Amino acid sequence: MQKSQNVTAVTETNGVAAALGGHHTSPDTNAGKTKDAKEFGCSLGDLRGLMEARGAEAIVRLSTEHEGVEGLCKKLKTDSLVGLNGEQADLDRRRHVYGANTIPPAKSKGFVRLVLDACKDPTLVILVLSGFINLALSFYEPTSAAEDATQHLVNATTAAILANGTFMSTTEAPSEGHGTAWIEGVAILLCVIVVVLVTAVNDYSKERQFRSLQEKIETGQKFSVIRNGEAIDVPVSDLVVGDIARVKYGDLLPADGFLIQSNDLKIDESSLTGESDHIKKSIESDPVLLSGTYAMEGSGKMLITAVGVNSQTGIIMTLLGAGKAGIGDDDSTSTSSSSSSSSSSSGSSSNGSSDSSKSGDDDLTAKSVLQAKLSKLALQIIYCGTTIAIIALIVLVTRFCLDHYVFEKNEFSLVDIQMFVKFFIIAVTILVISIPEGLPLAIALALTYSVRKMMHDNNLVRHLDACETMGNATSICSDKTGTLTTNRMTVVQSYINGNHYTSQEAQPHGANLPGSTGPILMEAISVNCAYNSMIVEPTKAGEQIQQLGNKTECGLLGFVNRLGGDYAAIRKKFPEHDLTKVYTFNSSRKCMMTVVPYAENGQNIGYRVYCKGASEIVLGRCTYLIGSDGKPHQLTGDRLKEITSTIIHEMANSGLRTICVAYKTIIKKGTRDVEKTEIEFAEDSDIDWDDEDAMYQNFTGIAICGIQDPVRPEVPVAISKCKKAGITVRMVTGDNIMTARAIAMSCKILEPGEDFLALEGKEFNERIRDENGKVSQAKLDEIWPRLRVLARAQPADKYTLVKGIIDSKATPQREIVAVTGDGTNDGPALKKADVGFAMGIAGTDVAKEASDIILTDDNFTSIVKAVMWGRNVYDSISKFLQFQLTVNVVAVITAFVGAVTVSDSPLKAVHMLWINLIMDTLASLALATEQPTDELLERKPYGRKKSLISRTMVKNILCHALYQLIIIFVIFFYGDTIFGIKTGLYAPLFAPPSQHFTLVFNAFVMMTVFNEINARKVHGERNVFKGLASNRVFCVIWVTTFIAQIIIVQFGGAWFSTAPLTLQQWIVCLVLGFSTLIWGQIVATIPSKKLPKAWKVGKGEVQPANLHINGDYNVRARSRAVTLRRSGKSLWVRGMFIIGNHLRVLRAFGMEKSEKAAFGRTAPAMTAEAAERWRASYRKYRHQKHQEKKATAETAESVKSADWAKEQKEKKKTFKQIKQVARGKSLDKDSKKHHKKRKDQTNVDMEDIELN
């Protein structure tokens, strides 16, 4: 009961008491709510108390206090069949009394808080300390002229070399005097303020963008409710107490409530309780449904009784917010803080062992390929900058000591301390220049810009790093239905009464079918389809029929209408709440069955079971088949083979999905004579509806339907683009192999003459598993490179394939895999994939929660667009790197050489401010906003191991840096002679700006600005102007930069340390700037392939767990490992879509604990006693369930032999030990011996345990 201990610990803290008790409602408000509650007959407190009960206690309280669910419906003024009337006044009144279905979000960081966060940067702290020391020492006046001259020289050196791109003095330079030495220290502090403000503004803007994205995700969540007798989808936030909600397979329950109707409904409550088994819900045994849990099987209806902060999700969020714990840490402080926000929670609910915690951290620190390589590159740059800074410091200190103490034989004085501080500032400044501080901004801009644009291309990105990871994808495992096809199902062929109707126009009319075939077929389809599947006839000419719900079932319902029937009228005869039993479709059974009462002459005489599903599977369960005379005939093995080969295979080869419809009748003994196809029973208690195997046999086949799902016309072109881009597309589908192969041929996944594999799931498993049934990576490596189609695939097969491709080292470049999924069971595969795509239309909440990107149109072409945007992000960051590193190299070398040669720098501090502004902010905006082009799909993926900076980029960086350095040093050392102007070398500290140094500055900026155009191409392209006109942002920034440079040079004066230049000098600078374009063409002629392979940076596969770059763009540390069974290990909120999103936002925005404490304070108080009652009731319920299982086991043991019982006990113990190992728990000595003994006897696949 680790989870209970955690809740107790949180509840008992002072923080919880303060937060939960800090909310007080005014007497007037309470009085108003009490008055409204009397109108409904049930107060908020009554419902909250009722929801604390579990199992039998909940049933008893519901029955005694409210006369059952129907009585509670009456008190809440709702109807279990019709629902609420939907009037806005009624909905508002319910929200006023019982609350809205929203959880108050955490207050976003204010600008002042962001400023304080920016001040925590270690580099800025060092500079602030240096500034204060410098400022304090500046007021000391040296006593000797020699010391005064020395101090002036040092001041000149440091003022010139201060190269943090943000150092600027706002005071006009004085002409002389030691009394102004304080300006340098003040300038340092002022420029730190500028840095902090720029950082805070950037973070504030970025936070607003992330909030906008988060709202987009959350507002897209809808749920089906019944209002005014009609089923409608409403936003989750619009749900109110009293709503009748329809629960279906894959739904995330958005509120608490009681079950009204259950069709084999099973719920995954592991996110709340840690219980790994799916809980079967029924009105008789366990009717309580809790928010934050998932419907894993079946369907049903529920009465909503608690929403928002009063639901289980809201209560937990209130506790988490008040407890100041478990949500996450500020990910701007360290790598571990950004990655352990989730793992710390899971660790607290596990054994607490270090091994387990470490494993969780390792999973959560996984970054994308690009982020990992950028982190490694940043470290390499910092190492180089640190080395240069240390060398500069050693040279300056050594030279000063030799000159001052050895040669001049001076004594040590306070001035010397000031000089050493100056030298230290110079070294720190060189280090600051080398740090790629603009890199996180460029990444954030590229990602957020791309994410906004991708929304227009039907890609809703949930995790920002997924969009650039997609650019590296080498393999796509795609579903068929709805992704490659239109998902508009139509029955175009059928096999009825021994006749094969081969076209849609040739389909028969129901009245013309012999015997009772027509009515039985239409009833079998209408009743045995989910009642939320329906077709809406067009209201205007030219419109198509609208299909709602499951598209396969909609195709069958359309077939009923074409037969002359009315599926809606048939359903009225069999209301959903009167259905005896529903066995919903699942991937293992491959069929759906519905049991309805069967009557003759107005008298119920038994039951009829309708079945539909995969044709070869359902037909194999049939013992009879309706023939041409309308009567059932024995279905022999030979007849079954004939139908399979001539009908099913022929339809499948035409790309049709084949569905078999069957039925059987169960007649009560004594009502009438039983026919040969019917089954007799004595009493209702004799029928075990839970025995699916008994139900799933002895059917009579009615018809086989061939359903056409046309391939999307744009898909073949998109797949051809993927092939050209070096991306392998694989189709994973549940259809049979022939249908799958035919669709693959239509999509050009398979083409004539290619030696690729198309396998069924069964054969796939036989080929990849060893003699013990375990997946062999070696065998899998022999299969997956040639595999293109996987048919009749189970979700576990998809997971095995994805995991095998990702883990494989069979190819030189490790594969990066994208996966599409829509079902609940696709969750593990979506999580395991590098990028998971969920279907926005057909996808379940489970699939969407597990995904990285949601396809809002379920279209494969949107995936191709995601690839383009991903590669565009990669290219945008590469362009910025190429540009920034060139400027970095030139600036660092210039500052270093100036410091160690003439104790002066050609670039002043204010010049470096402007250059860094160009290099960081403006270049980020200009280069990170390029539009993607189809040319991006003409290159192969980068892969996991390819260098971040290619030989071409290294060539460009070094060649352009060398060219610029030569020009700068020529002007620096010989410019006065060349231009006939006064030299700026060895000028006094407070001398007015010189044309000499202004020429150096202007030439450098002109070359930098023109080189920004060169930086637009990173793959050796000749035409650097291609696409320039379409990038308005780049053009505006470039022109603005150019004009600003003219103003700074001509009118900046002492403020910008510039002197106006003549027209001739401007022409020279412009020529030098333009010459970089010509030089770029010369550099492009150097073949990159002939350069040394060592000219690569960031090559090899990166292990990013311990790498970090400022955390700005690491929005969420995503776990890529498959989720193990979560019994006792997972925090309650794991698996909750809404809560999970909110926690990710908290981590993305770097919320501090104090802010998290405020989260949830607006929620109504939940007392510690109430929380303890909740836990106690659940413990009591689980104990009751344990006793029931124990009693069942004892009964079984009394019937079975002692050997069988012993075998079962050993198996259970083995499974328990394996789960302990999976959770990181240790075994005692006896358990270890038993585990080793049973290891070879029991074939247990760990992957199956993870999935099942």
UniProtKB/Swiss-Prot annotation:
GO terms for cellular component: intracellular membrane-bounded organelle; membrane; plasma membrane. Residues 330-361, 1181-1252 are annotated as: Disordered. Residues 333-357 have a biased composition (Low complexity). SMART domains: Cation_ATPase_N. Keywords: ATP-binding, Calcium, Calcium transport, Calmodulin-binding, Cell membrane, Glycoprotein, Ion transport, Magnesium, Membrane, Metal-binding, Nucleotide-binding, Translocase, Transmembrane, Transmembrane helix, Transport. GO terms for biological process: calcium ion transport; intracellular calcium ion homeostasis; regulation of cytosolic calcium ion concentration. Ca(2+) 2 binds at N888, D920. Interacts with calmodulin. Catalyzes the hydrolysis of ATP coupled with the transport of calcium across a membrane. This is Plasma membrane calcium-transporting ATPase mca-1. It comes from Caenorhabditis elegans. The gene is mca-1.
